Curated annotation (Swiss-Prot):
Domain NR LBD, first and last residues per copy: 457-691
Matches recorded under Pfam families: Hormone_recep (PF00104), Prog_receptor (PF02161), zf-C4 (PF00105)
Free-text tissue specificity from the UniProt record: Expressed in all tissues examined: highly expressed in testis and brain. Also expressed in heart, lung, liver, kidney, stomach and small intestine.
Cited SMART domains: HOLI, ZnF_C4
UniProt xrefs under PROSITE patterns: NR_LBD, NUCLEAR_REC_DBD_1, NUCLEAR_REC_DBD_2
Protein name per UniProt: Progesterone receptor
Xref: InterPro entries: NHR-like_dom_sf, Nucl_hrmn_rcpt_lig-bd, Nuclear_hormone_rcpt_NR3, Nuclear_hrmn_rcpt, Progest_rcpt, Znf_hrmn_rcpt, Znf_NHR/GATA
Zinc finger (NR C4-type): 348-368, 384-408
GO terms for MF: nuclear steroid receptor activity; sequence-specific DNA binding; steroid binding; zinc ion binding
Amino acid sequence: MEDKSKQCLQDPMCLGIESKHYIGSHGRHQVDFLEEMVDPGEISLDSLIFQRPEDEVSYQKKGGGPASSDNNELEKVLDSILDTSSSSHLHPWDDYVIPEFQEISVTSASSTKTLGDLTTDKKEAGVWTGTTAVENKSIPSLVPKEQDTLEYSIEGQLEGKGRRHGVLASRHPTLPPDGKMPMLPGSAVYLPGQPRHIEEDNDNYDQKHLSPYPCHSSCSHHDGKIKQEDSLYAEYGMPSSNPATPGPDPSLEYICKSETAAAYDNFRSTLGKSSDKAIPVLPTSSTTSQNLYQPLSLNDHQQNAYQSGTVNDAFVPQMHLSYEQYSRPDDPDQSSQYGFDALPRKICLICSDEASGCHYGALTCGSCKVFFKRAIEGQHNYLCAGRNDCIGDKIRRKNCPSCRLKKCCQAGMVLGGRKFKKYNRLKPGRELDRIATSSPMECQQALTRRVSNSSAQEVQYFPELLQILQSIEPEVLYAGYDYTKPETPSALLCSLNQLCERQLLCVVKWSKSLPGFRNMHIDDQIILLQYSWMSLMVFAMGWRSYKHVSGQMLYFAPDLVLNERRMKDSSFYSLCIAMRQLPQEFVKLQISQEEFLCMKALLLLNTIPLEGLKSQSYFDEMRSNYIRELAKAISLRHKGVVASSQRFYHLTKVLDSMHELVKQLHLYCLNTFLQSRALSVEFPEMMTEVISAQLPKILAGMAKPLIFHKK
C-alpha cells in the first residue's frame, strides 16, 4: 500500500488525487502529504468559503468516487486517521498544519463540543457546512482532480445511521465570475432574514443539514427541501418566485431577505447572471463575525448549530451608494406607513405617562382616569400639604391627590362628559371636511345636528367644572359695623376699608384655587390681582345685591346694606348709583349662578400691563378656556344658536362695562387715600400697599383693558 501511494505521488497525473485523499496508517504519511500539497501561502480562508457548483455537478456526472477497488482501502485509512484510541496522527497534524488552519479545531465524537460551538467562535476562522446524515453508511465522495481539497471525516456515534462528515474545501483564491456570487452569511450585503420552514421526508433521519451555500443543497444535500412561503413576499410587495421559470438560485430566499424591495430585486436580478453592474453593498464598519441565523426547529427539536462566517471584502464587489438612497422617501404614502409621524406619541395631560385615550374629555392614561372617577364620585376633600403646586409626574402622581385632582380639572376632565373615541382611532377634521363638501342644505342640517348634540352633551359636561368654582367661592363676610356709634361718612369709609381688607384676602385665596391661575408666573399672578381686586369685589357685591335685595340696595355685607337714604348720606353717592346699575342689570338679564362664576373668573383676566405678561401665551389660552366655559354655561339654559349668541353678547357687554365703573372707583379710592389724614379715614396695610403700587399706573394708562366689543 505504501509503495502504491509513493508511486502515485511521483506521478503528476495522480498528484491531485493523492494530495486530496491521503492514504496512510495512523497518520504516518501526513507529513508527506503536506509536503506535496500546494504552497500554503496560496491558500486563504476566503478561498475555503467559495465552492464552484459546476465542479460538484460535473463530478456527480462522472459517477462519483474512485474505483471500487480502492473503497475498502480508503475506508481503512479513514478509520485509522479518526481512531480516537490512538493520538499518533494528531501530533503531526498540529505540527505541520497551515497557520491559516490553526483556528479551526476538530473534536472527536466523544467530545462535548458540537460543530455549532465551533462555528460560533468569535474568530473569523471559516464556515462549517454543518452535519448531515449519510444514508446506508455511504463513503463521502472524493473531490474532483481540478480542486486542491483537504477532506476529513468525523466518525459519529449514531449506530446504523452512517457517519457525519464535515468538509473543509481549500482552493486557490480566485475571484468568482460576475453574477455567480455565493450568498454567504456575514457579508454586509445581507440582512438577517426570517427562518424558513423545512419540509422533511419520512425516510430521512432526525438531524438534517442546511448549507449556507446557494448550490450546496442541490448538489449533495437532497434531504432538506425549502418550503416557499408566499406570505413573506407579500409583506414586501413582491410576487413569489416561480420555480418553473429560470431565475436566481432559490436558496437566496432562505438565506436572507433584504429590508427594502428595491435592494432585494437588485440582488435577485443580478444573481446567477453575468452582469457588468456591481452589486450594491451597504457601507459597514463591522469587523466581527455575526450570527445571522436564528435557531431552526427541525421535527419539533431545537437545532442549536448556528452557522456564521465572514468573507473578505476583496471577493465582494462593492459600490458605496449615497445615503440618500437609503433615507426615508418623501412619498406621503410611504412616510405615513414607515415614518414616525404615523405613530404619534400619546402623552397623558395629567402625569405625562403614555395615554390610553380620551377619558372624560381629556387625553389621559388609565391611572388618572380611574383616579378622577373615584375622586369625583367619592366626593373627597383632598388637602395639599404643600403650596398646591406639587409635581404630579408618572412617579410622584400618587403623592398629592389634591394637586392631581386640580390638574385633572384644569385639563378639562368632567365625569359624565362627552366620551371620545380612542386617540389612535380619531380622524380629526374628517366630518368637517365632509360637511364642507356637501350641499348647502345638507351642511345646514349637519351643523344643526352637531349643535343640538353638543348642547345635550354639554348639559352633563359643565356642572362638574362648576362644582369646582362653587367650592372655591368665598363665603360672605361681615363688616362688623357698629350701629351704636353715630353714622358719619368717615366712619362708613373706615368700615368699608376694613371689609375690603378681609375680602382682599379671600380674593387672593380664591385666585390660588382657580384652575390654571397658579401655572402662570408668580409676577403675573401678583399683577393680575393688583389690577382686578376692585372689579372682583364690586362684581361679587352686585351678585349679592341681586340675590338678596333684587338690586334695589347695595349689599356689601349682611350687616352693611346701603339703601337709598344711606347712599345719599355717604360721600360717594354718585358711585353708589353707578354700582347699583350692576345688580339691576343682573335682574334684567336674570344671570344664573353658573354664568356669574364664569364671568367672575374672566374679570380676573380682564386687565394686563401694556408690555404684556411673562406668561402671556398661557394667559391667552387660559382666558380662551374660560370664555368657552361661559359659552357652555349659557347653553345650559338657552337652547339654539341664536339665543345663545344673543345671551353671550349681553353678558360680555356687562363685562366690558365693568372697566368704566372700576376706573371711577380707582380714582375715588386714590383721592381718598391721598387725603386720608384730612378725611380721618384709615387704610389697612394691604390696602395701602395695593393702592400705592398699582393705582397710579392704572390711572396713568399703563394698563391695558381687555374688551369684547369695540365702542
